């Protein structure tokens, strides 16, 4: 069973989610990580927070992936593409459309792949999400960063 500790341990093949908050040891974890994934929602405030976070950590670890997430329509996607491409050319960007897969993963205790592969309907319904999700996994698996 996992335990909450005062400091964060360095664990291989692990994803840390700090929920937007700094915890003791975060910078050490970032320094030792192959990749740092920074989420960005389709609004100006989130874009500013993303910029602040990148500014704070890019000298510690430049292997940053921006996860542009929760966009609901073409206008929000275009907002993300325009602003992220214009301001963060040197980083990889993955786009996750707003999807029920997040809620379903939590509610049913299943992984994204388990939900995607449940049946033909879910494969079709999650098709676009699956494409970007697997693209993210390939980046994480096939490259160790720079």
Predicted regions and their residues:
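Structural beta-sheet core signal
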Residues: 16, 38, 65-68
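Conserved nucleotide-binding/hydrolysis micro-motifs of P-loop NTPases
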Residues: 71-74, 101-102
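Short, well-ordered alpha-helix to beta-strand connector turns
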Residues: 11, 33-34, 61
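Inter-lobe coupling/hinge region of RecA-like P-loop helicase motors
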Residues: 104-134
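Beta-strand-loop-alpha "switch" segments that mediate conformational coupling across diverse proteins
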Residues: 81-116
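Inter-motif core of Ras-like GTPase G domains
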Residues: 21-44
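Conserved C-terminal guanine-recognition region of P-loop GTPase G domains, centered on the G4
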Residues: 47-69
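Switch II (G3) loop of P-loop NTPases
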Residues: 7-26
